[in-house]
Regions:
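TRAFAC-class small GTPase G-domain
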Residues: 1-181
């Protein structure tokens, strides 16, 4: 079974750590090498292969096209183009962005998940914890997110856990796509 690339958008407020997560998942950096956040201009596409994903009982390799999208609203005019052919959305926020995050995530979810008619299974929320005392419970989201998986991630202490969470997420995207294919 061979599939085309999976187009996954990574979205969220500026400085929530999207690029670091994208780089880590695609294995282009070690976390120790991650410098201070630099704003992404528009979008950056990271392509990599995710091995051994279980699809309908068979292990397969999936090509991922991870679109690391800027959180800067200057680039909002690009949103319609970003949304074309989207198969999944990863929303990212961090303790430093929780004040703006609630409204921002709602807007992004509406535009990139609800409007293109993705299911909640095709979306995941990564709460990017920068230290161990950060708690996902401090994130108060609307009922819109009641069906969306919300995962606290900590790259410094739990990078491998993030890879597992990401693989699980990709599996749920594939299941959702196959159901509607």
């Amino acid at each position: 079974m061979h599939m085309n690339k999976l187009k996954i958008l990574m979205l969220g407020p500026s400085e929530s750590g999207k690029t670091t997560i994208a780089n880590y998942l695609s294995e282009s950096i070690n976390i120790e090498e991650a410098g201070p956040p630099r704003p992404t201009q528009g979008v950056r596409i990271v392509e990599f292969e995710l091995p051994n994903i279980n699809v309908n009982g068979k292990n397969t390799n999936i090509d991922i096209e991870l679109w690391d999208c800027s959180g800067d609203h200057r680039f909002e005019s690009c949103w319609p183009a970003l949304r074309v052919g989207v198969q999944g959305a990863i929303l990212v926020c961090s303790p430093t962005t929780t004040q703006v995050a609630t409204r921002e995530l709602e807007l992004l979810y509406n535009y990139f998940v609800s409007q293109p008619k993705l299911s909640a299974k095709q979306c995941v929320l990564f709460y990017n914890c920068t230290n161990d005392s950060d708690d996902i419970e401090s994130l108060t989201l609307s009922s819109t997110f009641s069906k969306v998986s919300q995962v606290a991630i900590n790259l410094k202490s739990g990078g491998n856990r993030l890879k597992i969470d990401f693989s699980n997420y990709i599996t749920s995207v594939l299941q959702a796509i196959n159901r509607y294919a």
